[in-house]
Amino acid sequence: MENMDHNAHSVYLMYYHLIMVVKYRRKVINDPISERAKEIWGYIAPRYGIVLEEWNHDIDHVHVMFRAQPKTELSKFINAYKSASSRLLKKEYPEIREKLWKEAFWSQRFCLLTAGGAPVEVIRQYIETQGEKKH
């Protein structure tokens, strides 16, 4: 079993897969922009108890795998990250402003999936069989 994270009251292992898309899928993410976006993540994430595991990008979106704590308010973190990274990326890479729609860098929407652990059906079966006598 993987090493679990813990705090004073619980033990947990919570992985997430986040996909953030550039507004209108504008093709503006290159290696330097992705690397800077990752650096910004590294600055903001610890304040929310988030640990980066993996980061990768395509020209119009990024994929991020991270761990979080049970108390982490994920939507607040994601919105804070998108706001700060949008502002900084547009300031530091002014050439991308020409390709964006108005001032928005990221789409308002995002995709957030849980990851890791046992498959849902295995957990469902485990819960359903609790309390049954074994022969």
Enumerate the predicted regions with their spans.
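Basic nucleic-acid-binding interfaces
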Residues: 1-135
